[in-house]
Amino acid sequence: MSIINKIIFLLPIFFFGLLGQLSAEEIKKIGKFKDWEAMVVTEATGKVCFAQSSPILQAPKSNKRDAKLFIAFRPAEKIINEVSVTAGYEFNKNNSITAASGKNKFKFDIKEQGFAWIADTKIEYRMIKRMKKGSRIMITGYNQKGSQTIDHYSLLGFTK
């Protein structure tokens, strides 16, 4: 899937959470499972199912950001376990964005429009596998000024 299609898909979802302006017909909530929500949206290419979560802890505390972690499924495009994240700001292109759970670390390769993705589906698969076993995942990113932010996500409810 192209970066443009990913951005077109994620921006309305992000703003739905931020502003609550999309109608129930556009994004349908399937359910809330502890710290995760499952939703479905219909695009021109077909249905897209996704799970999302907000951080349970953010650093620095003084920054008010709408960070989210997403896992998307696009059956019509044969895409499963597509991992993406937004920290609520435009990422610095010179610094890495990483996810860490236990001793496992994963790097987000693609950064566009305030979102980041993992380019390699094998790495996404390993990350999902780790998320199913873990209790928390930590996303580290850097804003345009180079300041570090760390978002801690609970994995309770990730496997329903």
Predicted segments, located by residue:
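Bacterial N-terminal signal peptides
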Residues: F9-L18
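Bacterial N-terminal signal peptides that target proteins for export
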Residues: M1-F9
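A generic "folded-domain core" signal
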Residues: A24-K160
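Sec/Tat signal peptide C-region and signal peptidase I cleavage site
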Residues: L18-A24
